A protein has these predicted regions:
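N- and C-terminal low-complexity/disordered segments
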Residues: 1-101
Length: 101
């Protein structure tokens, strides 16, 4: 049985190549506001939500014991299909759960 809930978030899944690619696509957006440059930027796990596009909640390892939680909206192909960062939470740790914000 699928874990897709219409309008709901999936369970947390291990990050894959697609998730890492999304992170690479939005890294510059994430670094803009706090004006930080992350040498490490590796997707660890994620959740997703199908809306008029796809919302992603991604845990990203940025070095040492530091993690970010990213909210990324992936637009539908008819709307250019781009990823846009809609939220960033700093100061997370490896075992922190991914909770929509």
């Amino acid at each position: 049985m699928s874990d897709v809930i219409c309008g709901g978030w999936t369970k947390t899944k291990k990050a894959d190549e697609q998730t890492q690619k999304i992170c690479e696509n939005v890294k510059n957006q994430v670094e803009e506001e706090p004006q930080k440059n992350y040498a490490e930027f590796h997707a660890v796990e994620y959740r997703s939500q199908v809306v008029a596009g796809i919302n992603y909640l991604i845990k990203v390892h940025v070095g040492g014991t530091n993690y970010l939680h990213l909210m990324v909206f992936h637009k539908l192909p008819c709307n250019a299909g781009q990823e846009v960062v809609t939220g960033v939470q700093e100061h997370h740790h490896k075992d922190d759960p991914l909770v929509p914000f």
